[in-house]
Amino acid sequence: MNTEYMDYCFKSIKRRKKNIIKTSFTIFIVFAAVTLLILIRTNVYQWQLQSVKDRFGSWFVMMCGSDGKENSELKGHPYLKESGKAVKVNNVYDNGGEMTETGIGYMTEEFIRLGNISTEEGHFPQKDDEAAVDWNTLLELNQGSSLGQDIVIRTVISDENGQTEDITRTYKLAGILKSYTNSWAGGDRVPGVIVTEQAAKDIKRNNNAIYIYTVDDYVNDYEAIYDGLKKKTSSSLIYNSSVYEYEPWSGGNIYDYMYMIIVLVGIAGITYQLSVYSTGRKRVY
């Protein structure tokens, strides 16, 4: 081994020690910044996505069908996981006897969980004379928003002969739910006045049911899966685009700009160190 050459190399490195340290530190800072940005991007996206699911539900597709007749294609589909059901037994009628779009019915615990439906005040109905109402529906009813107050619901039921009868039910406002009827895709199909299953049966006129399904975690081509599901069912199928087409921060472009800025700063720092080193060499020689 040429010891003189090695000594020369070590002396050269020692002489340029400050420049080498500065350049290495600049490169380290750039890599650390990029790594930190990747971690921030992942965590922020997960936080934003969870916030969206809290508002619009964790469900993937919603099917409007009949109570007791869940679509077998969806129920046994390999890409779909859990399901929940809400039953709209009747429509609310206004004081003039006109039917409104507001529905009354009940929800299963699975539907409440998958829809991330929660109470802002109070609780879900526990007794047959209690009702929980989402905020949007409560505003439409225009009967007040104090827990424990009476909520008067007018509906129409039919007997076995097809004869209709106007009936009025009074419920105690047990809970106020965060709005979903005016924010979800297909939220207008979901009953906004929630009562117990038994109370719903007492005023049942319709046999309408809404089923929601979640998708497996490993699936990422959501739109293609949705298109495939539509071809397998003749029922009305609604896609939760608010969640599964969600793009945080303008589709992630802001992160691309941040990457570019960090890389440019790194290049500028390294270029500066090289220019300082080159100037130092000229002075020596």
Segments (PLM) and residue ranges:
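Short, membrane-interfacial amphipathic segments enriched in basic
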Residues: 1-7
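Short amphipathic alpha-helical coupling elements at transmembrane boundaries
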Residues: 7, 11-15, 49-53
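Alpha-helical scaffold elements within enzyme catalytic domains, especially in hydrolases
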Residues: 12, 73, 228, 276-279
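Cytoplasmic juxtamembrane interface segments
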Residues: 16, 194-202, 279-285
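Hydrophobic alpha-helical transmembrane segments of multi-pass inner-membrane transport and secretion
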Residues: 18-46, 250-285
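Basic-flanked hydrophobic alpha-helices used for secretion and membrane insertion
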Residues: 42-248
